[in-house]
Amino acid sequence: MSNLINGKIPNQAIQTLKIVKDLFGSSIVGVYLFGSAVNGGLRINSDVDVLVVVNHSLPQLTRKKLTERLMTISGKIGNTDSVRPLEVTVINRSEVVPWQYPPKREFIYGEWLRGEFENGQIQEPSYDPDLAIVLAQARKNSISLFGPDSSSILVSVPLTDIRRAIKDSLPELIEGIKGDERNVILTLARMWQTVTTGEITSKDVAAEWAIPLLPKEHVTLLDIARKGYRGECDDKWEGLYSKVKALVKYMKNSIETSLN
């Protein structure tokens, strides 16, 4: 487990715990805060990442109620009220222990899905390669908000499956680059570091790792993304699309080379 960076549990995490206790009751195995809050510290635009482990599948009505209640406490992207966005993942422990790839998630809440939620769509259970990385992060670096240490209820994710998850997630990530330049660039840097070193770090630390490995013409853009993530500059991407594409192509090729 990990120590909290700033010594304070984010308010949205506390509110999430209250909501899932109310909705799930005795079916909760554990609730864990992970991600930036416990690994490098929350940055200006960081989500609050919460993993909820339950012991059975969620009925449709429960997933609907969970979505509706999380929408009231999660900050919309770009809000000026200092309310952080939530990313809440729910898994049924029996679907991931014993381990199998790709892992199955029971539910996910994220602000990039708010438009779908507002239209009444509810996230269904699905197999998700990226969940392998989420579970590896949570098992290694998390704080229990409820229940035992995450390492006692989650099995270790094999590095081979983390590498498979990166390979399988790469196409969809790159397809979403327009309008999400910073996140895509930094996620690629983190993927590159992970497939090369086996470590999963924060996005800004991954960028610091990658910058010395880049050709000079790509360094500035990755550093802009890193500084924007840290709140050290107002990163603007208008007029830079061709350069962004070139950087993305370089990192994608580097990731694929490491995977092979």
UniProtKB/Swiss-Prot annotation:
Key word Nucleotide-binding present: yes
Gene Ontology molecular function terms on file: adenylyltransferase activity; ATP binding
Keywords, alphabetical: Antibiotic resistance, ATP-binding, Nucleotide-binding, Nucleotidyltransferase, Transferase, Transposable element
Domain of life: Bacteria
A GO biological-process term: response to antibiotic
Catalytic activity: spectinomycin + ATP = 9-O-adenylylspectinomycin + diphosphate
Described purpose of this protein according to its UniProt entry: Mediates bacterial resistance to the antibiotic spectinomycin but not streptomycin.
Record's protein name: Spectinomycin 9-adenylyltransferase
